[in-house]
Amino acid sequence: MAKKSAIEKNNRRKKMTKNAAPKRARLKAIIADKSKPMEERFAATLKLAEMPRNSSATRIRNRCDLTGRPRSVYRLNKLSRIAIRDLGSRGLVLGLVKSSW
């Protein structure tokens, strides 16, 4: 089980990213628009740089919903390989069968 502080930090980042997403998108659109004057694009770059780092989507870590494990998490069901194996051995994952040959 992951540290609760790490899980909470990631949850705060998710919330901050969700709140700041429209503003970040607006500023990035201004920066990418070559028809705007250079001064306006530069001002948008400075405003984007002033925003908190944790409001960026790249700072979010994919974590297992059950254990909080940060590595080897499947995006499809947001579970780590270990959690999938445990649930599968108990028969709780539909369609998952232990392989044998």
UniProtKB/Swiss-Prot annotation:
Gene name of the encoded protein: rpsN
BP GO annotations: translation
Similarity comment: family membership: Belongs to the universal ribosomal protein uS14 family.
Protein name, entry field: Small ribosomal subunit protein uS14
PANTHER family: 30S RIBOSOMAL PROTEIN S14, SMALL RIBOSOMAL SUBUNIT PROTEIN US14M
A single GO cellular-component term on record: small ribosomal subunit
Pfam families: Ribosomal_S14
Residue ranges, annotated region (Disordered): 1-23
Subunit and interaction comment: Part of the 30S ribosomal subunit. Contacts proteins S3 and S10.
Biased composition range(s): Basic residues: 11-23
Keyword Ribosomal protein in record: yes
Alphabetized UniProt keyword annotations: Ribonucleoprotein, Ribosomal protein, RNA-binding, rRNA-binding
Role, per record: Binds 16S rRNA, required for the assembly of 30S particles and may also be responsible for determining the conformation of the 16S rRNA at the A site.
Lineage top rank: taxon: Bacteria
Gene3D superfamilies according to UniProt: 1.10.287.1480
Organism: Rhodopseudomonas palustris (strain ATCC BAA-98 / CGA009)
One GO MF term: rRNA binding
Listed Basic and acidic residues bias regions: 1-10
